[in-house]
Amino acid sequence: MQVKVVSDRVTVVLNGVTTAENVILENACNREIPAYAEGQILLIAGNAPLNVREMYIRELPATPRFELSEEEAADGFEVLFDGTSMHKWTGNTTNYVPVDGTIYVMAQYGGSGNLYTKKEYGDFVLRFEFAFDREGVNNGIGIRTPMGVDAAYHGMEIQVLDHDAPIYKNLRVYQQHGSVYGIIPAKRVKFPPLGTWNVEEIRAVGDRITVTVNGEVILDGDIRQACQGHNVAPDGGKNNPYTVDHKNHPGLFNASGHIGLLGHGAGIKFRNIRIKELPAAKTKK
């Protein structure tokens, strides 16, 4: 038998057969908090004798742990992913794997392939870093979205995309990285080489969404003004002349919802994810 523990994940191999792979290690004493980062190894025997032999251990390098800066801590930010524990997340925890202090995405497109915060957020500032490890990566950040739906329409999707890749040469402007998908196009940003970490901030205050990448504001717009208040077609049809993608976005004006990592394929990793909740802004109607 072999037991491997990395961050908050455990893999068990019994007689050459993997019986558990990258399963979240829960805190048996209190499931509301993550498992401890370190501790003793305990052998537990039930009602039958337990015989163990040839037991040995190899310690692995510690996973980097992210902590808030003094400024962010004083400003009210909260860590959503510290590099080791995903206890603040739910959904597809199988294809979003902690690797060397990052969340590595292996999920494919679809509601069941998404990872969500357990908590819902309304107005907030979300900060994180991301890196593409291959060309043509497509992903997204869902905001104010329910779980298990297409966030681009039933909430909002802030596009995450390697739009410089040749396969996206015919990309529509509202699909560029940082866009509020189908609603407000973002300014096109030039990414550094693959593997380089990018810094992003998403600010959602009422109807105003602001996206900053590597210190540059690439989107600052009002979602209600962008569609003239018509997030769905006035005639009840499927074609909406007021949105740039001409589709209905019934969840566009959600007051709150989950934040989601929207897997459209492998090849992206996230780290240093933190958030600051803001007082609810007054929305013009």
Model-found features: residue ranges?
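Carbohydrate-interacting regions of secretory-pathway proteins
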Residues: Q2-K285
